[in-house]
Structures are given as structure tokens and as C-alpha cells.
A protein has these predicted regions:
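A short aromatic-anchored loop/beta-hairpin motif
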Residues: 18-217
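Sec-dependent N-terminal signal peptides
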Residues: 4-12
Length: 217
């Protein structure tokens, strides 16, 4: 499991006084001659509900060998959750009250390096959950509602609940620039990938598939 350097929930991304460029670096200039990069933005299209697969040459320790589910993609920027970094912190340790009602929840997941004290939830529900963010069909991201009520009112299969601390974020144009540079591949998301029972090998499996796709073109 991915270690979060001890006291996970005490980590912060930047001092409160940090300006926007510290948290969201300015995007690199876009090279419009990079046809492969632009094709990457379109097939599948960069949008909410796709997966970002870290390229082999992405060495940023926050994102190296990560799989990220894009939960928001708007003119204000992009937000996502890292899917394949379970921590060594149990839900019982981080959220003892929730654990009383949901004792089967095991480990907290590292969602990304921004706002690591914030908690959010991914879950599968066959019924619409009003007021939540539907990422793809039957998959919901919850970070504003009361987690207790959502979990207690709706009977959720324990295989399809993940709790995350922190998230990943990009300023407008920043992720597009990183895609064109080759830092990421885009892949279609589905329930089996989002709630993969072996997150430790998820990147290895997906990087083989995405690179094979490019080689075959």
C-alpha cells in the first residue's frame, strides 16, 4: 500500500498564504503541431468520467504510476481522484463514527495532493442520488452531502464504496498541456476499473493496454 509519510490527515499542499500559481502552476504553451497530442485529447475526449493513465515518463511523486478518475471537467479546470493508492490508514482510524456503522470499510485512499484533510466518497448506486455528482452511469462522487446519511439510507454493496482523502486538480488548460506533452493517456472508465480489487497492479494493466493502442495505430 502507498505510504503517506505518517500523519496523513495532517498533511497540507501549500501554506494558506500560497498564491494560485503555487497550487496550480501555469500551463505550458500548447504545441499545435503535435497531432498525436491533439488526437489524445479527442479519443476518447477529455471529459468528466474518463480515466487518466500516467505515462511512463511522469516522475512527479504525487502522480507517478497513478490512475485518476476525472470527476469534474469545466471551464474552471479539472478535478479528479487517484484510484490506485490505498493508504495504510484504516477508515476506523480516520473516521471512527462512520466505521461504527460501516465496519466493513477497510482503508482510506489517497485521492490526490490537494486538500488532504478533506474527505470524499465514490460509490455505485443503481438509484439516482439527488444532489450528488454522477461521474458515469451509476457511479457517484460525494463531497458535500453528509456521508453518514448517504451510506445509511442507501444499501450500498461494500465492494463499491471507496473513501478518499484529498483530490487532484488542474487549472484551465493545464491538464490539456500535460496531455499534449505526453504525461497522461486517456482511457474509458468503467465500474470494474474504478473499484478494481487489486489497485496495486491497476496501472501496470492499463499502461499495457493504452500503449498497445498507440502502437497499433
Amino acid at each position: 500500500m502507498w505510504k503517506l509519510f505518517g500523519a496523513f490527515l495532517l498533511l497540507s499542499v501549500a501554506p494558506a498564504s500560497a498564491d494560485a500559481d503555487t497550487i496550480f502552476p501555469r500551463p505550458l504553451p500548447v504545441n499545435k503541431d503535435n497531432a498525436r497530442g491533439y488526437e489524445q485529447l479527442l479519443n476518447p475526449a477529455l471529459n468528466k468520467g474518463v480515466l487518466l493513465v500516467a505515462g511512463k515518463n511522469l516522475y512527479d511523486p504525487n502522480f507517478e504510476k497513478t490512475i485518476i478518475l476525472v470527476t469534474e471537467y469545466t471551464e474552471d479546470g479539472t478535478v479528479g481522484l487517484v484510484l490506485n493508492r490505498p493508504t495504510e490508514i484504516t477508515v476506523a482510524e480516520a473516521l471512527p463514527k462512520l466505521s461504527e456503522y460501516m465496519p466493513y470499510l477497510d482503508y482510506l485512499y489517497f485521492g490526490g495532493p490537494i486538500a488532504t484533510t478533506s474527505i470524499s466518497l465514490l460509490l455505485k448506486s443503481e438509484t439516482r442520488l439527488p444532489g450528488t455528482n454522477q461521474v458515469i452511469t451509476n457511479i457517484y462522487h460525494i463531497n458535500t452531502l453528509d456521508l453518514f446519511n448517504v451510506l445509511l439510507i442507501n444499501k450500498i454493496d461494500k465492494r463499491y464504496i471507496r473513501i478518499y482523502a484529498g483530490f487532484a486538480g488542474w487549472a484551465p488548460g493545464q491538464l490539456e498541456s500535460e496531455l499534449i506533452r505526453g504525461d497522461w493517456y486517456i482511457w474509458h472508465a468503467d465500474i470494474n476499473l474504478i473499484f478494481n480489487s487489486e489497485p496495486g497492479i491497476l496501472w501496470d494493466e492499463l499502461i499495457r493496454m493504452v500503449t498497445a493502442k498507440w502502437v497499433s495505430r
